[in-house]
Amino acid sequence: FSRADIAWGARIKAFLEDRLEKVRVFWPHEIAPCSAGLQEIFQANLKALNEADLMVAMLDGSQVDDGTAWEVGFFFSQGKKVLGLRTDLRRAGEMEGARVNLMIECSCHSISESLEELLDRMQRLIY
């Protein structure tokens, strides 16, 4: 991830934690140290996904990050809700009208275009 991606993710985490009282936000960059081995990082992320009730997937970029795509599919297969966040104005889907790859888009309960819209959708699901 780029420094800008990491900073954006940290901003999203802080935004949600400041506004949602009963929510604990898992942030992948805090779950396992970067110095950890591949298996350790994978297992830590898998544990966090299994413990989570709701997922926010950052979908910006010309293509959804490979790891994010895997996590969205895994989470969706467990019957849990994924809320996408795509602030990128570019379209990355291969189908007309799709914002991202159709498998990702259809796995998301919703895709928000701003933090405020994401917060509103989360509040409706949680409270």
Predicted ranges, named:
Residues 1-127:
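Conserved catalytic or regulatory cores that recognize and/or transform ribose-phosphate-containing ligands
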